[in-house]
A protein has these predicted regions:
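Positively charged, small/polar-rich N-terminal and surface patches that mediate targeting and assembly
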Residues: 1-112
Length: 112
């Protein structure tokens, strides 16, 4: 199993969700967060002077998939979140050793 962690623009969350649902990947956790990378936050002007706003609003998405679905999910997330502008986000893929559905006790792929 693989845990895909995607950091995307907040306005792309629904597009990413729809892309994953289209692949039959039905579970996802989404959190609001703030961050910065190459863009080093963003700058704003207030009555003339430029102010550094620091962090940029982002959405952190987590989805656990079967090994066989990981590459398709990664491609779908990248396509759905892409604008071509700085700040589109990043995707990380991490190995998952075990998973368990608490309600039923199902394990690993069956828990997804």
């Amino acid at each position: 199993m693989q845990m895909i962690v995607a950091i995307v623009k907040p306005n792309k969350v629904e597009a990413v969700r729809a892309a994953l649902v289209g692949l039959g990947i039905l579970g996802m956790t989404a959190m609001e967060c703030k961050g910065y990378a190459q863009q080093l936050g963003h700058n704003e002007r207030y009555r003339g002077p430029k102010l550094d706003a620091g962090f940029v609003p982002k959405a952190l998405l987590m989805v656990c998939v079967k090994d066989t679905d990981a590459e398709r999910a990664l491609a779908a997330i990248a396509q759905a979140a892409h604008t071509g502008n700085v700040g589109d986000g990043k995707v990380f893929v991490l190995g998952v050793d075990q998973a368990m559905r608490i309600r039923t006790g199902e394990r690993d792929d069956a828990a997804l």
